[in-house]
Amino acid sequence: MKLNEKQLQQVDAQVKRLLKSGSFYGEVYRKAGISGVSSQEDFEKLPFSSKDDLRNAYPLGIQAVPEEEVVRIHSSSGTTGKPVIIPYTAKDVDDWAIMFARCYETAGITNKDRIQITPAYGLWTAGIGFQLGA
């Protein structure tokens, strides 16, 4: 994926914020020798996270904002191991709704259609996105 200059600046700002916060991802980047992202080459050096990385951060080790900014907490089911707990800010929830709305639009769904959300999602991470995007 080729990033434009604005995207590189946005990624750089996020990486620097995470490094400053000492969060889970800040530590991942620090250990990988990442100090910022100013080029496509820098972007391509960003490490991936595995499911085990996220499980090892249980319960709220991936939280990168102050507690008072967390408005929802969702979880994976934990059926294949320790659940992954994901805290969301209000902006995260809004962005998630927009992303799902775009998915519905791409699928050809309009305001004349009805959507049935069948999973018993409870705290399932994607459940609220399905609901809010509708």
Q: Where do the model's predicted regions map?
A:
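Conserved AMP-binding loop of ANL adenylate-forming enzymes
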Residues: 105-134
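Nucleotide 5′-phosphate-binding alpha/beta core
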Residues: 1-75, 80-98, 102-106, 110-112
